[in-house]
């Protein structure tokens, strides 16, 4: 069996993090050198997952992060607290891997819900197991969910995820809706071969069920580094596939820093009206308005999904650092954020960590 290593990027230690932070503002918003303010925190709880989507993970053989390297519940309460006050984070999203595999998920959500000012709290999940936990998560303080679902065709789903769990995901969506975790959003990464067919049925399903579809261009974040730009099913391809079947109009509302370009769908003979979005991270990059900062399951700050460097907050935590030192390191990490991801540059290098070890 071939074992795929997670890969460890260049990590700034405590001394390096402090040096970078000296150039960053010492208070106020969490800024980078280009004037962008990070207000959206993505927190990965685990790198493990119970599906094996080909664009993210190999079928087998992926080395997991050792348990002692993962942040514990107390650390996962403290870091978001620092992020909200004094760093000004207003939205916290818990991700994985698959965050439902984290046994302390409800505890971590409840801690975030106690923060003041209270951030919006959301979850990105594959939906397997969500039906049983949606009500408890809502009670803990979760506001809404995004559920990953690339197709409603059972055979296509099994081929993409290497697991026959479509019914579980559909049940999870329904459970989230029943628990009031709305709007329920569906994240779809389309297969280059079947995606044009899948997206038509997926949008029809979402409109009928009252979910909001988000189609996300496949990015170079797979563990096997098999992504190819010339195989991309881009946003223009998605719209071309949908337009023969639906009446679409651009949403006139200001987009702001949101990653999705939204489209309104007029009611048709067989479908209600609604909206969907396309996140064109590759073909129409939105790096200039990015407002995200990322915390990996092992306590590293990443300023971008495609960063080649990380800043170690776990080391600071476990060395007994105070909140001010952690804040300074975080500010330094974000101050060094690049202008863009560079995917379309000839010298682009794919991150060593796959998406499962970063957090979406």
Swiss-Prot record:
It catalyses: GTP + AH2 + S-adenosyl-L-methionine = (8S)-3',8-cyclo-7,8-dihydroguanosine 5'-triphosphate + 5'-deoxyadenosine + L-methionine + A + H(+). [4Fe-4S] cluster 1 binds at residues 49, 53, 56. Its cofactor is [4Fe-4S] cluster. Keywords: 4Fe-4S, GTP-binding, Iron, Iron-sulfur, Lyase, Metal-binding, Molybdenum cofactor biosynthesis, Nucleotide-binding, S-adenosyl-L-methionine. [4Fe-4S] cluster 2 binds at residues 287, 290, 304. PANTHER family: MOLYBDENUM COFACTOR BIOSYNTHESIS PROTEIN 1, MOLYBDOPTERIN COFACTOR SYNTHESIS PROTEIN A. This is GTP 3',8-cyclase.
């Amino acid at each position: 069996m071939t074992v795929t290593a997670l890969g460890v990027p260049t990590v700034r230690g405590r001394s390096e993090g402090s040096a970078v932070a000296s150039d960053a503002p010492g208070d106020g918003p969490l800024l980078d050198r280009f004037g962008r303010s990070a207000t959206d925190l993505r927190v990965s709880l685990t790198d493990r997952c119970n599906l094996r989507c080909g664009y993210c993970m190999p079928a087998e053989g992926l080395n997991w992060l050792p348990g002692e390297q993962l942040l514990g519940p107390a650390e996962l309460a403290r870091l978001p607290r620092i992020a909200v006050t004094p760093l000004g984070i207003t939205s916290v999203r818990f991700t994985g891997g698959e965050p439902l595999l984290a046994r302390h998920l409800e505890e971590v959500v409840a801690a975030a819900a106690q923060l003041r000012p209270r951030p919006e709290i959301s979850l990105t999940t594959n939906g397997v197991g969500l039906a049983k936990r949606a009500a408890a998560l809502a009670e803990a303080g979760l506001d809404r969910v995004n559920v990953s679902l690339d197709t409603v065709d059972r055979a296509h789903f099994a081929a993409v995820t290497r697991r026959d769990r479509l019914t579980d995901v559909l049940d999870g969506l329904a459970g989230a809706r029943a628990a009031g975790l709305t709007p329920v959003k569906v994240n779809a990464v389309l297969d280059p071969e079947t995606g044009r067919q899948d997206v038509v049925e997926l949008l029809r399903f979402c409109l009928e069920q009252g979910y909001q579809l988000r189609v996300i261009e496949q990015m170079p974040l797979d563990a096997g580094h098999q992504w190819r730009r010339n195989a991309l099913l881009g946003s223009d391809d998605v719209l071309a596939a949908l337009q023969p079947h639906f009446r679409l109009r651009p949403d006139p509302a200001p987009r702001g820093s949101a990653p999705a370009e939204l489209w309104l769908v007029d009611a048709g003979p067989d479908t209600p009206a609604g909206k969907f979005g396309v996140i064109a991270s590759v073909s129409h990059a939105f790096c200039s308005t990015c407002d995200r900062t990322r915390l990996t399951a092992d306590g590293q700050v990443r300023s971008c999904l495609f960063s080649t460097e990380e800043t170690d907050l776990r080391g600071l935590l476990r060395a007994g650092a105070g909140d001010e030192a952690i804040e300074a390191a975080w500010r330094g990490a974000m101050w060094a954020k690049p202008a863009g991801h560079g995917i379309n540059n000839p010298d682009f290098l794919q991150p060593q960590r796959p998406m499962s070890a970063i957090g979406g």
